[in-house]
Swiss-Prot record:
Contains 5 disulfide bonds. It is found in: Secreted. GO terms for cellular component: extracellular region. Belongs to the scoloptoxin-05 family. The lineage of its organism: Eukaryota, Metazoa, Ecdysozoa, Arthropoda, Myriapoda. This is U-scoloptoxin(05)-Sa1a.
């Protein structure tokens, strides 16, 4: 009987881990040098993205030709950034774009665990539990 409960628990946790939750993506939205935040070290809390742009959060860094960071923009975006993160412009400047799709992932501390990490942890816990039985 305990193993049946464990299987039911594992199935429920797997379902909630693998099925995307139905909620609006929350991203940090700021634009430097405009506004109250510099968008590099200070930025507002993540807010819900509008329905038309709620697929990805992004961060864009613009560097001058001398290599200095000119602008940081964090926002919501309907499409992911290209696979090549940085591109050089003709005038020697460079633009780097990054996208992600978890709440607040475009913040400075945006390293949030993905669903795969949760799934692996649940799988390991279940495996350990079965071995102990």
């Amino acid at each position: 009987m305990p193993s049946l409960c464990i299987i039911a628990l594992f199935g429920t946790l797997t379902f909630y881990t693998l099925i995307p939750s139905i909620h609006t993506l929350k991203c940090v939205i700021c634009d430097s040098p405009m506004g109250n935040y510099d968008c590099k070290t200070t930025y507002p809390a993540a807010t819900e993205c509008p329905g038309s742009s709620n697929n990805y959060c992004y961060k864009r860094e613009t560097f001058a030709s001398n290599g200095n960071l000119d602008q940081i923009r964090r926002n919501c975006n309907p499409v992911a950034a290209s696979s090549k993160a940085c591109k050089d412009l003709e005038n020697g400047a460079k633009i780097c774009e990054y996208s992600c799709n978890t709440d607040g992932c475009n913040s400075v501390a945006g390293m949030e665990p993905t669903r795969a990490v949760y799934f692996i942890a649940i799988l390991m816990l279940t495996f350990y539990t079965f071995i102990r039985l």
